[in-house]
Amino acid sequence: MGNGMCSRKQKRIFQTLLLLTVVFGFLYGAMLYYELQTQLRKAEAVALKYQQHQESLSAQLQVVYEHRSRLEKSLQKERLEHKKAKEDFLVYKLEAQETLNKGRQDSNSRYSALNVQHQMLKSQHEELKKQHSDLEEEHRKQGEDFSRTFNDHKQKYLQLQQEKEQELSKLKETVYNLREENRQLRKAHQDIHTQLQDVKQQHKNLLSEHEQLVVTLEDHKSALAAAQTQVAEYKQLKDTLNRIPSLRKPDPAEQQNVTQVAHSPQGYNTAREKPTREVQEVSRNNDVWQNHEAVPGRAEDTKLYAPTHKEAEFQAPPEPIQQEVERREPEEHQVEEEHRKALEEEEMEQVGQAEHLEEEHDPSPEEQDREWKEQHEQREAANLLEGHARAEVYPSAKPMIKFQSPYEEQLEQQRLAVQQVEEAQQLREHQEALHQQRLQGHLLRQQEQQQQQVAREMALQRQAELEEGRPQHQEQLRQQAHYDAMDNDIVQGAEDQGIQGEEGAYERDNQHQDEAEGDPGNRHEPREQGPREADPESEADRAAVEDINPADDPNNQGEDEFEEAEQVREENLPDENEEQKQSNQKQENTEVEEHLVMAGNPDQQEDNVDEQYQEEAEEEVQEDLTEEKKRELEHNAEETYGENDENTDDKNNDGEEQEVRDDNRPKGREEHYEEEEEEEEDGAAVAEKSHRRAEM
C-alpha cells in the first residue's frame, strides 16, 4: 500500500514536471519566433532605405550631367561674344583718338582767343582802378563832411530833447496838481450830494411822520367825540334812574355797559398805540404809555363801581369823567412828543449806520439812490400795514377793543428786529455783488486794452521788418544793375545819369520839405486811423526810398515816368489833407452835440458825473499806457535814426547820388522831429477822447 501510494505521488510529480517543461519550451519557441520576425522586419526596412538612397543618387547624377552640358554650351557662347566685343573695342578706340585730336585743336584755338580777351580786360581793369581811387578820395572827403554835419545835428537834437524833457516834466507836474484838485473837488461834490440826499430822505420821513400824527390826532378827536356822546347818554340814563325810585339798583347788563363806557378810552388808546409801536419799535415808550394810562383807568373803575354801593353818588354830576378826559389830553401830547423824540433818535441812528456802511463799502450814488428807494418802499408798506391794522382794530367806534399783552408785543418786536437784520444783510450782499461785478468789468476792460496794445505792437514790428527788408532788396537790385552796366561798357552814360539823378533827388527833397512846412494841418491827424500812422518816421523813410531809388538806378532811362508819378502824388496830397480836415471837423461837431445834449438834460448830467467818478481809475490806466507807448515810439525812432545813418554809410560806396540822398534824408527828419512828437501827442489825446465817448 505504501509503495503504491509513493508511485502515484511520483507519477503526479513527473507529470507536473513534464507539463512545466512543455510549457516552458512552448514559451521559448514563441519568443524566438517573435525575435526572428522583428529582425526580419528591420532587415526589410534597411533594404528599402538603401534602395531609396540608390535611386536618389542616380537622379542627382543625372541632374549633374545635364548641368554640365548646359555649362559647356554657355561657355561656347561667351567665347564667341568675347571675340565680337574685342573687335568692337578696337574700332571704338580708333574713333576716340580721332575725336581727341579734333578737341585739342579746338581748345587751342579757344585758348588763344581767350588770352586776347583777357589782355583787353586787364587794360579795362587798370582804368577802372584809377576811377575807383578817384571815387574813394571823393567819398572820404564827403564822409568827413557828413560826420561833421551829423555831429552838429546830433548836438542840436540832444539839446532839443533835453528842453522837451524839461517842458514835459513841468507839464506832468501841472497835470498831476490839476488831477489832485479835481479829485478833491469831486470828493467834495460827492459828499455834498450824499448829504443832500440824506436831508431829502429825512425831510420825506418827517413829512410821513407828520401825516401819521395828523391821522392819529383825528382818530383821538373822533374817539373823544364818541366818549362825549356816551357821557351824554350816561347822563340821560342817570336822570331817568333818579326819577324812578324803584330802579335805584341797576341791572348787571347796565353795569357792564357803564364799565365798558368807562374803559373805552383806555382800550382805544392802547389799540391805537399798538401799530405805532410795531412800526417804530420803541419798547420804552410802551411802558410809559401803560404807566400813563393805568392810573386814570383805576380811578374810573373806582368811580364807576361806586354807584352800586351807594345811591347818593348816582345823583352827583358826571364831572369826574370830564376831568379825566381833560387830564388825558396833555398826557397824550406828552406821549406824542416822546414818540417824536424816539423817531428822531432812530432816524439819527439809521443815518449813522448808513454812513458807517458807506465808509465800509463805499457804494456809488446809484446804489445809494436804490437803497433809499427800497427804504421808502418798505416804509410805505409799513404805513399800509398800519392802516390795515387800524381798520381791523377798530372798524367803527365800538367800545369792545382787543388788548395786546406785553409778551405778544415783545415777540412782535423781536420778529421785526430779526426782519430788519435780514433786510440789512440782503442789502449788504446786494452791494457786495454789485461791487464784484464792477471789479470784473474793470478787469475785463484792462485785459481788452492790453490785448489791443499787444496787437498794435505786433503790427508795428511787422511793418518795421518789412520796411527794413525793402531797402536791402532794392540795394541788391541796384548793385546787380550797376555791375551789368559795367559789363556792357557804358560807364560814361552811367556817370551822366548819376549826375541827373542827384539833381532830381535834391529837387524832390526840397519839394518834400516845402510841403511839410506849408501843411501844418497834417500834424493833427488822428492816431487810430491805422497801423501805418503809428510810426511816422518809418513811413517817411519808406516813401523816400520808393520815390528816390528807381530814379537813382544808373540803368534806368525812364526819367519821364518818375516825374509823372511825382506829379500825381503831389496832386493827391491836398485831397488827403482835405479828408483829414473833414474827419477832424466831424469829431468836433459830435463832441459839441454831445455837450449840448448833456447840458440840456440835468438828470443825464448827474448820471455822467457819477460815471466820471467810476471812470477815474480807467482814465489813469489809459494815460499810463499812452505814456509807455510814447516812450517806446521815441526809442524806436532813435534806433531807426541810427540804422538809417549806417545805411547811408554803406550806400555811399555806390555813388555820389546816393550820398546826396542819404545826407538830405536825416536832415529833413531832424527838422521834422518836433512836428512828429506833436502829432503823437495830439493823436493820443484824440484816442482818449474817442475812448471816453465810447464808454459814455
Swiss-Prot record:
Cytoplasmic compartment: which residues? 2-12
Quick one: where's the N-myristoyl glycine lipidation?
2
Question: Sorted alphabetically, which InterPro entries does this protein's record hold?
Answer: GOLIM4
Segments on the Lumenal side according to the record's topology features: 34-696
- The primary site where this protein sits is Golgi
Any coiled-coil regions, as ranges: 35-244
Q: Any keyword DNA repair? A: no
* Cytoplasm in keyword set: no
An example Gene Ontology CC term for this record: transport vesicle
- Residues that the record marks as modified (Phosphotyrosine) are 613, 673
Query: What the entry says about post-translational processing?
Result: Phosphorylated probably by c-AMP-dependent kinases in its lumenal part.
**Modification type Phosphothreonine: residues:** 626
Q: Can you say where in the cell this protein is located?
A: Golgi apparatus, Golgi stack membrane; Endosome membrane; Membrane
Residue spans with biased composition (Basic and acidic residues)? Answer: 123-145, 271-281, 298-313, 324-343, 355-364, 370-380, 464-476, 505-545, 627-638, 661-672
User: What residue spans carry the region label Golgi targeting?
Assistant: 38-107, 176-248
Membrane topology annotation: Single-pass type II membrane protein; Lipid-anchor
The record, for PANTHER family, names:
GOLGI INTEGRAL MEMBRANE PROTEIN 4
What is this protein's function per UniProt? Answer: Plays a role in endosome to Golgi protein trafficking; mediates protein transport along the late endosome-bypass pathway from the early endosome to the Golgi.
- Identify its protein family: Belongs to the GOLIM4 family.
* Protein name, UniProt field: Golgi integral membrane protein 4
Query: Which organism does this record belong to?
Result: Homo sapiens (Human)
